[in-house]
Amino acid sequence: MATLIPVNGGHPAASGQSSNVEATYEDMFKEITRKLYGEETGNGLHTLGTPVAQVATSGPTAVPEGEQRSFTNLQQLDRSAAPSIEYESSAAGASGNNVATTQANVIQQQQQQQQQAESGNSVVVTASSGATVVPAPSVAAVGGFKSEDHLSTAFGLAALMQNGFAAGQAGLLKAGEQQQRWAQDGSGLVAAAAAEPQLVQWTSGGKLQSYAHVNQQQQQQQQPHQSTPKSKKHRQEHAAELIYASPSTSANAAQNLAQSTPTSAPSNSSGGSTSSSGGGGGRKKAAQAAAAAAAANGVHIQKRYACTHCPYSTDRRDLYTRHENIHKDEKPFQCYACLKQFNRADHVKKHFLRMHRELQYDINKTRRHVSAGSGSSGSGSSGSGSHHSGGRGNVTINSAGVNIDNAFLEAQRHPTSSSMSIVETIEAVASATDMPLAQLKQEKMDDGAGVVLPLHVGVMQQPVASSSSGSSGSHGGNGNGGSGSGLLKPKREKRFTCCYCPWSGADKWGLKRHLNTHTKPFVCLLCDYKAARSERLATHVLKVHNKRACSKCSYLADTQEEYQAHMSDVHGNVGNANGGGGAVTIYTTTTNEGVAGGGGGGGGGISGNISGGGPLQEIIVNPSSMVGWRLSANGSLIPPHDLLTGGLPNAATQKRGSERLFQYLEAEGSDPEDYARLLKMDAISRNTASVAQDFHKAGGVHELKIPANHQLLFNNKLPSQWTTREAAALLYSLSNMGGGSASSVSGSQRQKFGMRARQHSTGEDDENTPSSASSSSFSGDEFNMSATSPLKLSRHAIKLEKMDEMDAKDMGPTKAMMATAFLEAANYEQTAIELLASKRKIKVENDNDEDQENQQHQPHQQHHSQQQQQQRLQLIKSSPAYKLNNNNNNNSNNNNYYKDKTSHRNAVHHHRQDDKENNKTKSPGTAAVSVAAAAATSPPSISGPSNQTPFLTQMEYQNLNRIGTQFQNYVKDIINKYYAAETPLMLAAAAAALPTATTTGQQQQPELDIENLSPSKRRRLLSETEEYIEYLRNKEDITLTIAPKVQPPAPVTSLLKRQLDLSTPRRSPKKAAPAHSNSASNASRKSLNQLATLLPLLADAASQQEYLAAPLDFSKKSSSRKQAQPKKIRLTPEAVVTLLRDKYLNRMVRQRLGCLKCNQLRKNSSISFNYHTLGSLALHKYWRHGRLGSSSTRREKLQAALQKRISRGQADKC
């Protein structure tokens, strides 16, 4: 639509003026003038005495000097493809149609002007015939059209569009002040150069939140005339800035905003008042750009409509009015099918389309009304305070203006039994009194007793129970009765189907609701009951277990009296509590019993005092009201931390059974659209991992109990959670220490926590270590070493060494030697890596000459390696709650790992060939270390006080010590199968050291003499073992699963030592794993490729045997109840068709029951069907080979008929 604004052509001083308000409200005026003037004509609509913009094919593209811009030329200039515009000096050339249309528009504008004058607009602006803008404080009636009437009418119509009715005295900006300011700007003031931002405050005087200028500094400087820029971008830069402040804005903030003059904020920073010509998307982008620009300059833009009950604010009145219903006491909408009440109309529609698909939805029946008497009395008593809480723009109709029958009102105050209180619509009242509907809606009386009727009309639907009685007489046969609403709705396409059953639904919400009937996510923690609905679970708990759960805390009452006493005592005044500082406000919803609820927040808190009833549903809860619960940023409730990130939490701090039941009970609010409740239930009940863990802790699965001070012994993991790196460390320690027993408690604990601290400091164990939330903490300073560096660890070891020296007289020299070994173990890993690198350089030679040469040099090499190895004692950690088979133990000191590893497949003992020789050459320091190691590997002494106390008791590891010899034999069978004769010692030791039943220290097996092995074979086994260790170092994706079978617990007498000194990053280059080779099983030498397959075989074998299931691993965030996915069939379509045919036809037909004649003709026909029942076979023979003739006879008949048709066609053509 294009419309002109009056131009002051005869006055150069006033020509080309740029109004700030015009530039700001230009887009809004387009819509206003389109509704005011209607459709445009060929040359555009214009008023009398104003120039007309004509569209021409050529001419200047900019606005000529002395002319003022209009909506037409601005719209044309913004479009690159639009033609140029020419201007006429007068309106004499206008056509007769334009004049007639203009006169009609003048009459319409005058009527609108009169309505505004009657409604309280005391200022009317007039102008002379020359179209000069002159402020006129008094009313001067002029017969012709006033050039300023367009702008004043636009202001009134703008208020009418924004608020739904005409504005009063406070509703419009004073036209005199505005025109006076325009007159001062007549010299061509440029807005971007000298205009200050105008702070427009929207007051809360009524439904129309009128705006008034707060900026008192209206001094404007006179500057030379400049033409208005032709592009919208430049117009925004030259336009003045309007800043809107809500009523809640303080005076200081308003003054600061008025004094601040940011230059980069665009002119459309008024939020929702200005709208782009591109539609809704353009308006959103403009508002976002304005908000971003204002935020960048430190200007906070307030929305026009701000809720006094919550922080909600908006620029749209319809959204604000809809939001008001949330805080209202009553629910003005209801479902006319089931009479369920709602506070928003869109909620009714959503409910209706979900639950009553077979009925026809009618929005006119969703409005719920109370009786006229109670409604009028309530509205009258509320007074002006009902403006904010009413929610809908109510029109007060004076009783003198509308003659409503008193009998009709009396009938509504006393409804009959067949119909509830039915209020006639405004349209019906208007038609009955012969009053125009438009005038009835726009009429607004300030005082006088009247009847308040809602502007949004509707008819109360009768109850379903009385629908059979038909509509009452007041309906007048308009079909609004319950029986008339039962029209069947055409069924929509069902696009959502269940994967478990043939169910199908129309929306995703119904599918999710239906899937709960299969998954049953609501689990009773007191028994094995599972429910698909939370309310069914609550009913089950009440009826079966006779418990009543509080929805606000973890209290469970046995009787209703105890529950009510608890609610009154504990939660009785929770709504009236006043919070201090930034306390969180408690908002309540639903009203049934009249219980007052609310809360005040001092400082930054927001107060709210809303009438509530029944069990108060908390939307935003103070965290102190629910112990252990947390409040998220969006207001939803987060359940207590359940330690879902792994580890074994301390059971003493976990609630069990019925105390956790309240987490799964649904709140008792009747509103299904209570989004806070849905968020709460989603955070509690839908958390499947939490449900699985709570069920596990409530007694569903036997849980392993490990003391807090012993959890680091396992790396916070069970054997089923070990990676190959940890498994390699276990094999490494088992091969080093063939036999072991429990040492002193303090020494093993120091070594254990020292190694764990080093792993935390290097960060290598983070991939399999649970989060810090689930890790155990220790009160003593001796154990708080989980984040220390190796330097601090060494200092701590020195401190422990000094402490041990003080007790050396009582404890003996063993403890001091272990402390020294612990101190030297910090530098062990680097040396071990160097040894591995040096050993990899040794090539295996199979020639006899090289073997003899190696035999000559071997004593020297062994001696050199022993000197390096004996200087450091390997760090020993206690084994993970199971014991090495003591049949594999020996009493010799086995500190050398690389030189004395020789093995047979059944030989799992460590033997030193040159023990005596090496012991003679030891230095004093090395001898002390060796004595310490020998003491660690010796059998326990009954008289020794340190050996009498085991590190771990029987009760602590009762579930991990139930391991018998069955699994050990099974693993040995696998090793014998794949490694017949020459299994390396590392693997043999690992197989023998796998968890077995506990044996006494005196049970020992006679040692096997393995000295007869040649040095070349011994060196070869050593090389293979080192390569396998390195492979385990580099391999991260294989997990060793050791799932022991349940065995009766056995007494604990000795423990193995294991080391975990493999966490430091390797400095040697990684060796790529070689490809798998299919070598024969009877080969003399087993390659590394075969060795690498042992670990996956062990894991697979353990999983197939179904030994003791590992406890739940809560470090995995994935849900334990996943929806069943359809199986993927990787077959060709023909094969799939064949499988489906065989699957379903085989159920009802007999195999090999086919037609003999068809089988004989199979060679000629590519398609044959051999699956028949007795009935189908009889029918087939009758129709196929019966009296109608054989297939050949019918074929001949068909061919003859075809030939006849062809001949007839040819004859017709001829």
From Swiss-Prot:
This protein's UniProt keywords: Activator, DNA-binding, Metal-binding, Nucleus, Repeat, Transcription, Transcription regulation, Zinc, Zinc-finger
Annotated Gene Ontology cellular component terms: nucleus
A GO term, aspect molecular function: DNA-binding transcription factor activity, RNA polymerase II-specific
Highest taxon listed in the record's lineage: Eukaryota
Zinc finger (C2H2-type): 305-327, 333-356, 496-518, 522-545
Biological processes, Gene Ontology terms: dendrite morphogenesis; embryonic development via the syncytial blastoderm; eye development; larval somatic muscle development; negative regulation of compound eye cone cell fate specification; negative regulation of transcription by RNA polymerase II; peripheral nervous system development; positive regulation of transcription by RNA polymerase II
Function: Probable transcription factor involved in the development of the adult pattern of macrochaetae. Required for accumulation of achaete (ac) and scute (sc) in proneural clusters. Probably acts by binding to the proneural cluster-specific enhancers of the ac/sc complex and increasing enhancer efficiency, thereby acting as a stimulator of ac/sc expression in proneural clusters. Also required for correct development of the embryonic/larval peripheral nervous system (PNS).
Name under which the protein is recorded: Protein charlatan
